[in-house]
């Protein structure tokens, strides 16, 4: 008989930095999931990624207190900020307060295309051109200029 799925949790955790402190500990602990087991597995899976980049993760937990999880690619906004040279870290730079009027940086179409290749699996796009348009739209919505 298959394990009974009780639910799922969606979190964004910095790559390689999962630990039992909030938000990870309380989110998993109140559902009876082994926190340290998850933290070790997540950190092992994300050790090849750049440390500190937020990674979306979907955790499915079952009636027998076991779990599975899927890591996704970093958010497009993080990749765009890095490509534009905006500050990431404790107090990251935000996008423009008035997108379309004020610009906070520039990204080239080649950078947008590279980000689209990375995000292709998570985007609702059939080909690279459609994914590139989605990422370019996100860049413009953040107040980044997309240049050739």
From Swiss-Prot:
- Keywords from the UniProt entry: Methylation, Ribonucleoprotein, Ribosomal protein, RNA-binding, rRNA-binding
Q: How does it assemble?
A: Part of the ribosomal stalk of the 50S ribosomal subunit. Interacts with L10 and the large rRNA to form the base of the stalk. L10 forms an elongated spine to which L12 dimers bind in a sequential fashion forming a multimeric L10(L12)X complex.
What GO biological process, any one, is recorded here? translation
Record-given protein name: Large ribosomal subunit protein uL11
| PTM section of the record | One or more lysine residues are methylated.
- Which protein family is named in the record? Belongs to the universal ribosomal protein uL11 family.
Entry function: Forms part of the ribosomal stalk which helps the ribosome interact with GTP-bound translation factors.
**What HAMAP family is this protein classified in?**
Ribosomal_uL11 (MF_00736)
**InterPro entries in the cross-refs:** Ribosomal_uL11 (IPR000911), Ribosomal_uL11_bac-typ (IPR006519), Ribosomal_uL11_C (IPR020783), Ribosomal_uL11_C_sf (IPR036769), Ribosomal_uL11_N (IPR020784), Ribosomal_uL11_N_sf (IPR036796)
Query: GO CC annotations?
Result: cytosolic large ribosomal subunit
What GO molecular functions are on record for this protein?
A: large ribosomal subunit rRNA binding; structural constituent of ribosome
Q: Which Pfam families match?
A: Ribosomal_L11 (PF00298), Ribosomal_L11_N (PF03946)
Gene3D superfamilies per the UniProt record, alphabetical: Ribosomal protein L11, C-terminal domain, Ribosomal protein L11/L12, N-terminal domain
Keyword Ribosomal protein included in the entry's annotation: yes
Q: Which gene encodes it?
A: rplK
CDD domains per the UniProt record, alphabetical: Ribosomal_L11
């Amino acid at each position: 008989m298959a394990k009974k799925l009780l639910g799922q949790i969606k979190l964004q955790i910095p790559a390689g930095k999962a630990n039992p402190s909030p938000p990870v500990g309380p989110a998993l602990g109140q559902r009876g999931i082994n926190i340290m087991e998850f933290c070790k597995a997540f950190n092992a899976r994300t050790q090849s990624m750049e440390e500190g980049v937020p990674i979306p993760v979907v955790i499915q937990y079952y009636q027998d207190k076991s779990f599975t999880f899927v890591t996704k690619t970093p958010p497009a906004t993080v990749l765009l900020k890095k490509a534009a040279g905006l500050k990431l870290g404790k107090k990251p730079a935000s996008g423009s307060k008035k997108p379309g009027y004020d610009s906070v940086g520039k990204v080239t179409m080649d950078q947008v295309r590279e980000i689209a290749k990375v995000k292709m699996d998570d985007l609702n796009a059939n080909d690279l051109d459609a994914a590139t348009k989605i990422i370019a739209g996100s860049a413009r919505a953040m107040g980044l200029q997309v240049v050739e």
